């Protein structure tokens, strides 16, 4: 079990692992933020990826969301971080988002599948965590 995780089944941690597998050279910082600015049309924004001039990437996820919605918004923003600011919501971004979804589900299967004996302690789970420096 990963002793660094507060929730042993954290979907945010699982998404982080998926992102690092798909985009190992891209670094980001993420925050929950209650006051994300509205978009240019005055519409509420639930997530934001900021690409600073110095190359730093910061992701913000609105705190008003359910966990399920926040995870989806986080994945959406991670896709932006993975493909870069110039991609917007084009095919390259969509592929990154879909790949994150697939990798996230693969990680879930590795970590929690009944085919792993016992669950939570499977070899693939331990290897994934060790490769990422979590254990």
Model-derived regions: residue spans:
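Active-site recognition of the HExxH zinc-binding catalytic motif
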Residues: 72-84
């Amino acid at each position: 079990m990963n002793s660094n995780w507060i929730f042993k089944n954290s979907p945010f941690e699982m998404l982080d692992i998926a992102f690092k597998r798909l985009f190992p050279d891209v670094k980001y910082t993420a925050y929950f933020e209650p006051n994300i600015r509205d978009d240019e049309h005055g519409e509420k924004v639930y997530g934001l990826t900021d690409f600073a001039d110095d190359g730093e990437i910061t992701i913000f996820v609105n705190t008003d969301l359910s966990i399920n919605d926040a995870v989806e918004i986080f994945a959406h923003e991670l896709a932006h971080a993975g493909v870069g600011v110039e991609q917007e919501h084009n095919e390259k971004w969509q592929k990154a988002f879909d790949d994150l979804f697939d990798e996230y589900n693969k990680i879930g299967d590795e970590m929690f599948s009944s085919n792993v004996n016992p669950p939570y302690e499977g070899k693939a789970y331990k290897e994934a965590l060790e490769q990422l420096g979590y254990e």
